[in-house]
Amino acid sequence: MAVRTAERVSREVSDNFVFQRSRLAYVEAAGRIAGRVLEIGTGTGYGVDIIAPHAEHFTTIDKTRSDELPPMPANVEFCEAKVPSLPFEDDTFDYVVSFQVIEHIKQDRAFVAEVLRVLRKGGKFIVSTPNRPMSLTRNPWHVREYTAEELGALLSGFIHVERLGVEGNERVWEYYEKNRASVHRIMRFDVLRMQWWLPRWLLQLPYDVMNRLNRRRLHRSNRVLTEAIEMDDYRLVEVHDRCFDLFYVATK
């Protein structure tokens, strides 16, 4: 069995629950952006064709270039770079977008400071990240996860922050509850609660293996439900504790 890392959002059908939710962030951002746009965290590039038509120029960066990256439209430039430092001049971009990335970054305050630096006055930072109260277990690929209050505090250097979240309908919740029960069956063997105190690097491979086995098993036993979830089963609302993701729009 090929094991796909949980570091990046996957288009594998067993990951449909997460993939459709992640697509929503791009679609919502596309209706808000214009001008020069920077994306931090290209991943496999599934958001490029969503954002690019709405931008005058779209720069997308990641620490490595994914083999799954699609051909780039004429107004798109891929840049290989590591954060928190950004290889751009001050006041370069009208919008910065970053989805499911900030939880992976050790120096999150330095990262936000760099976003502020490269944004023009009045520019906006659109960011999404998992809502910690909804996580079923520790993800060792994440340095940390945020509550709504914690993400708001991290973005306190902006003049205004619109605090939204992603919630799902009954179909989404049915899948979530089945997943929660499955994860609980696996984690009952962690009697020493090692997931909470072992180093992240030591947990990453076991997590990837068990996460992939769990999602594929859920798909086999709930094929119709897993494949039926669509982006429209999610929506943006004012943030609350039972949102799956946080989606904040911060204005410089």
Regions found by a protein language model. Give the residues of each.
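A short glycine-rich, Lys/Arg-flanked "PGG" loop and its adjoining helix->strand segment in the class I
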Residues: R109-K121
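A conserved mid-domain beta-alpha-beta active-site/ligand-binding segment of alpha/beta enzyme cores
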Residues: N179, V183-N214
